[in-house]
């Protein structure tokens, strides 16, 4: 299946997708036990309504996109949101060229289609165009994502032991940090 181009979330225009953002976030936590801000169980008023905590999180991210503190990239498959990633900007005079890669999440239904790679390529393209040349990110040690980032040219910086609480079994897990200098590509 041919994928449409990655698009940038536009506040107002794409607000109708907030529930889909939240449901993908929940799916990734429940399916892969992704260390991504929240723990299950997720509570739904009805099947079409995501957990209020997760929905509010994405509404806050949409507000940050409106304030140009974040750029959110989306991959659609037809009319459905399949995955997303955010580029966070640094609000400091000593590092205006730094950015953070946040919440690269692809719905389990749309995996193995190259969506993560496409999202990251678009994020890097836009980052460069904005003068954001040094990207950093983190992910759980041993997660599938840990293997993706080196293939995309990210350098493993190191790990912090017992960094986060696993949504699977509440044990403490390590977090791995990566960076990529876009000036060198």
Predicted segments — roles?
Residues 7-12, 16-103, 107, 120, ...:
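Acetyl-CoA-dependent GNAT
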Residues 104-111, 140:
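A short, internal acetyl-CoA/4′-phosphopantetheine-binding micro-motif in the GNAT/acyltransferase core
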Residues 110, 114-122:
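Conserved acetyl-CoA pyrophosphate-binding loop and the N-cap/start of the following alpha-helix
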Residues 120, 127-140:
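Conserved GNAT acetyl-CoA-binding A-motif
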Residues 136-140, 150, 155-172:
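Conserved catalytic-core motifs of GNAT/GCN5-like acyltransferases
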Residues 145:
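Helix-turn-helix
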